[in-house]
């Protein structure tokens, strides 16, 4: 059996997307070759499911239908959609195998799109991010601010850091291990990046989704979807209409419990579609 997986994920220098090869290599032992959604065998961490929808453009639709025969198979592990409107229509791949999806919202939508009942775990594979650090660093910051890549240069992000006595601005475009280490050094996290929140959950760090702007792609679906896996209502803190949260408000806004996180880790490890190789930690 090959120890390389052909994986589709976004080509963006962003911690969330780059968790794909890191987690798959550390937890399951596979090297990862990044491929397009047309040729990849696995769709994992991220909001890539909409890429597999049948397109409305006739030329694109023809290309997809051909691809559905020439490369019919894709395994799906922990993925989701980015918009509510994405979860409509049907998939062009003829053999989509769903092992886990990001949340209950996506599970129900995929069931509707495929006409199949899915008895599978829900959760984002990024919840295994804590596996990437050999040891947990000591706490250095009372609060970490993790802007989405589109919010990095927003003056409101720098202003938010100044509102707290011991805060750290964390750049999701830095090396992912550096980003995870800095998140783990925080006692609380405020993030407009979904995977900033997921990483904090992975380390059992209280966190709160904050909104700086409308710049990030999506209509909030991916956040609603992620929290639906934990049966938690998504309640973002919009800094355009609310003052910066106090540390106690941020901590009180964290609804996910550590025992839920550990159970998701266990279920997602078990749901990975390929057996661990090369000393993967599974």
Give each language-model segment a name:
Residues 1-282:
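Active-site anion-handling motifs in enzyme catalytic cores
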